[in-house]
Swiss-Prot record:
Reactions catalysed according to its record: a plastoquinone + NADH + (n+1) H(+)(in) = a plastoquinol + NAD(+) + n H(+)(out); a plastoquinone + NADPH + (n+1) H(+)(in) = a plastoquinol + NADP(+) + n H(+)(out)
Encoding gene per record: ndhH
One GO term (biological process): photosynthesis, light reaction
Transport in keyword set: yes
Membrane topology: Peripheral membrane protein
Protein name: NAD(P)H-quinone oxidoreductase subunit H, chloroplastic
A GO molecular-function annotation: quinone binding
InterPro entries in alphabetical order: NADH_Q_OxRdtase_suD, NADH_UbQ_OxRdtase_49kDa_CS, NDH1_su_D/H, NiFe-Hase_large
Keywords linked to the UniProt accession: Chloroplast, Membrane, NAD, NADP, Plastid, Plastoquinone, Quinone, Thylakoid, Translocase, Transport
Record carries keyword NAD: yes
EC number: 7.1.1.-
């Protein structure tokens, strides 16, 4: 009887671009030696739509609906970066009330993004039950978005100089109720997931990334903070009004997939702290209060002029002044950035004294973070690829643009 010949040559496997664990249309060409990964080549570009070139042929107000299609799970951040650039170029001041509402929306969007990362990440490594609990909480966030903006996703809420509309009746109370509820659910996640021995076996020590290596690769966000680097643009740049709130940078030093999970879980708790402080300190309070005071002001026109002027203050508005659709970008260049859920989202903007930007360069965090994938999966097992890729947290709309 002849024995079968054992083949010792390498095997090449195509994963994607429609594999459910790819989180979009990503293709991986993986070279295997048995079950060990020798090499991995990501193939990008399946979702490229020419977002940068479109920006150069649109006014900013026309381009705003497009930007929500980059990272379509954290659209508030793409809107924020789109209006921040023209605001800085035109020296446009944003009312404090609008800035507070922006922070609330950004942090809710961060929570929604992290939740939508956590559910599929757990499903990737074989845990189906948390997926349904996590999507239940995500629905509450989307209900808040729908009440405030009219849209569950693709909100189109930010405007140059402020926001599109003030918060509706009862929204603040509803949001505070959600914050109290969600903090208890995060504790449940920790009991259900963090101490699970099967989960720890899949993520602990998998995809280890050192701090110096993370800096050299230009990584940002939870990928960087999970490697021991305390870097958060909300603390560094102090954009909007983040410097007025008390919160801490969440970081870990192990640099593995577990550390990246812990950073994101802790960030959701910190986001709730920021939202609660912003809701309690919102200039003018709920919209109902502002409207009632405005009505009282009209009814009592003979009241003290100082009291009248107090509630007509610039800081109580939701937008400074609506710019013209032909708003011109001054002839200078500027780089603006925000701390998105996946890392540093930036735009390099060049104006040329016209309504259209001369150059609109997008720096997507997912695209930069994905470059480290081949290094992280080498010498790992084939099954670990999904764990490592999931821990990076990519959205292909943002990667390919």
């Amino acid at each position: 009887m002849n024995r079968p010949v054992t083949r010792k040559d390498l095997m090449i496997v195509n994963i994607g671009p429609h594999h459910p664990s790819m989180h979009g249309v990503l293709r991986l060409i993986v070279t295997l030696d048995g079950g060990d990964v020798v090499d991995c080549e990501p193939i990008l570009g399946y979702l490229h739509r020419g977002m940068e070139k479109i920006a150069e042929n649109r006014a900013i107000i026309q381009y705003l609906p497009y930007v929500t299609r980059w990272d379509y799970l954290a659209t508030m951040f793409t809107e924020a970066i789109t209006v921040n650039g023209p605001e800085q170029l035109g020296n446009i001041q944003v009312p404090k009330r609008a800035s507070y509402i922006r922070v609330i929306m950004l942090e809710l969007s961060r929570i929604a993004s992290h939740l939508l990362w956590l559910g599929p990440f757990m499903a990737d490594i074989g845990a189906q039950t948390p997926f349904f609990y996590i999507f239940r909480e995500r629905e509450f966030v989307y209900d808040l978005f729908e009440a405030a903006t009219g849209m569950r996703m693709m909100h189109n809420f930010f405007r140059i100089g402020g926001i599109a509309a003030d918060l509706p009746y009862g929204w603040i109370d509803k949001c505070l109720d959600f914050c109290d509820y969600f903090l208890t659910e995060v504790v449940e996640y920790q009991k259900l997931i963090t101490r699970n021995p099967i989960f720890l076996e899949r993520v602990e020590g998998v995809g280890i990334l050192g701090g110096e290596e993370a800096i050299n690769w230009g990584l940002s966000g939870p990928m960087l903070r999970a490697s021991g680097i305390q870097w958060d643009l909300r603390k560094v740049d102090r954009y909007e009004c983040y410097d007025e709130f008390e919160w801490e940078i969440q970081w870990q030093k192990q640099g593995d997939s577990l550390a990246r999970y812990l950073v994101r879980l802790s960030e959701m708790t910190e986001s709730i702290k920021i939202i609660q402080q912003a809701l309690e300190g919102l200039p003018g309070g709920p919209y109902e209060n502002l409207e009632r005071r405005g009505f009282d002001r009209k009814m009592n026109s003979e009241m003290n002029s100082e009291m009248n002027s107090e509630w007509n203050n610039f800081d109580y508005r939701f937008i400074s002044k609506k710019p013209s659709p032909t708003f011109e970008l001054s002839k200078q260049e500027l780089y603006v950035r925000v701390e998105a859920p996946k890392g540093e989202l930036g735009i390099f903007l060049i104006g040329d004294q016209s309504g259209f930007p001369w150059r609109w360069k997008i720096r997507p965090p997912g695209f930069i973070n994905l470059q480290i994938l081949p290094e992280l999966v080498k010498r790992m097992k084939l099954a670990d690829i999904m764990t490592i890729l999931g821990s990076i947290d990519i959205i292909m709309g943002e990667v390919d643009r």
